[in-house]
């Protein structure tokens, strides 16, 4: 193992090129080797300063620097004392900052030559150099996305962006949202100083800047420096600062997300003191977050679980990588049109079929409108847009499916209709073509009975709007082959979506679980709980949309239809149909003609533009809203527990078998609160562990019904002290 991952090369002009290249992994991260290497390199720079004219910092990896080592932040804690862990992280963080500060003040100019992605800790390293040049190459991405993991930039990112950009600019454009920017956008924001077109141009540009700026210092190390836009005590900044906590609260809707508030505090407090004191303030807030449960949850979900899935964690072994050449989409409505678009965007030829050619053309028009917007925003070029649209072929002729190797049906939700459309094309497509259905409710095994090759039939459930929603739920039927599952996972990754795999069951995983959240909220309405109280509980739990609002958007009539179909299927199988307090409320609203948002009336009233104007007073009158008072946390946890307990049942029944798939599917597919790390992580991290969760479930069951009784499998796992 090399003792130093930062190679040193000095040219005849005295310019030292430092190249970061961790020999033990594919990306550079802030692991122990980097920490030792940085310290040794800074010591050498200081010792040889008189023979150095300047320094270029670059990377041998395609990614400039991948940031902090999240494994170090989450692993190896076990039952260690919290104070011990916090002290260790504090010491490590301060050591990093000390060496970065030495780098930027050792007396010679340093320029970063950013040859790829510089996110999080990677960007923080460059902020400790006097100049930043980025290559505008594929994969180049610049930013401080720590807030999306429940963290703040702990390597000086808060302190230096505030001093570089000003408090308001740093907070609003970099820190609080954590955007990942292309190099030109990063330059516009002020995070980088120059952009070159290729990696080959980086070193010459860096050396040119060094020759022209031999005495360069950081702005904050220069005499007379003031924070751009003013310090917290200046009138212009003092005007907007008091509103920031309220703005954050409105954005978070009361959800337990501590990172944005910690970022705001670190930025403002740090701007009132010298840079060295500011970095200590930043460290304290960083450590409070990284040792907290929310960050641990979010790191697990958005880094480890997501990485597992996108690396093909649920993909069967032993099958070559598959690339779809020609995709046949049946049904050119909203879903079919959008599936055609994302497939064509990934470079695939698409046949878009409907029963009417005008309908098929309207389906293609969906892509044309999206491309018009992309052109106006500078997200694509005319040439690329024309090529994409040329790949979509609207048709009514089943014979145009000749050569299709992947079919995705998005027709009306009827077994008979779906059987019919597959019969039209089954003998036309390639003999081993994937036969996929975008159904969200119908059993895949039943649909597969309508084709000759049931082993090639599979569910490919997209979420609306397809071009924005990142998840695809892949459903295995009873006869679906591993080979077809592998193909569909490859297709999903190719269109830049995240695949989760579930087994066939009515409602699959996502639709089945989200229904319990909605039902629990609606049942509370029927109990006489104030609807606004219920909506507030949903928001403060961290759901993206409040439950009654979401019900209106999904349509109450559709909810009733799915419930009735499910009940009929359960009866046909000899099962017991269980009543729920939500059913009578939905039925009564539909009797009043209140189907939801599209009808202009549901739980809410709507104006002529479809905007909510308030909860319907008739609802309060009917159910004597406010007559029943329950603890706020009970309402929050009724919704969270309903989904979590249903997920346990899905594991028991084999509907879902992967914890990462369940966590990511719940967050990306049905809006389970991100701070929890997903529906399974919510159970694992509950206070008192699984036993604490089981005890609370019993408590909720005693108050609100037996459907909160924990499944026996969960009780047994808790008794053994295990986790999922």
Regions found by a protein language model. Give the residues of each.
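Structural motif
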Residues: 15-19, 54-58, 111-113, 133, ...
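Conserved CoA-thioester-binding segment of acyl-CoA-metabolizing enzymes
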Residues: 1-58, 101
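N-terminal glycine-rich phosphate-binding loop for ADP-containing cofactors
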Residues: 9-11, 21, 73-80, 84-85, ...
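Glycine- (often His-adjacent) and acidic-residue-rich active-site loop
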Residues: 48-51, 59-98, 118, 148-150
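Gly/Ser-rich catalytic serine loop of serine hydrolases
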Residues: 112-122
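Conserved catalytic cysteine-centered active-site region
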Residues: 99-112
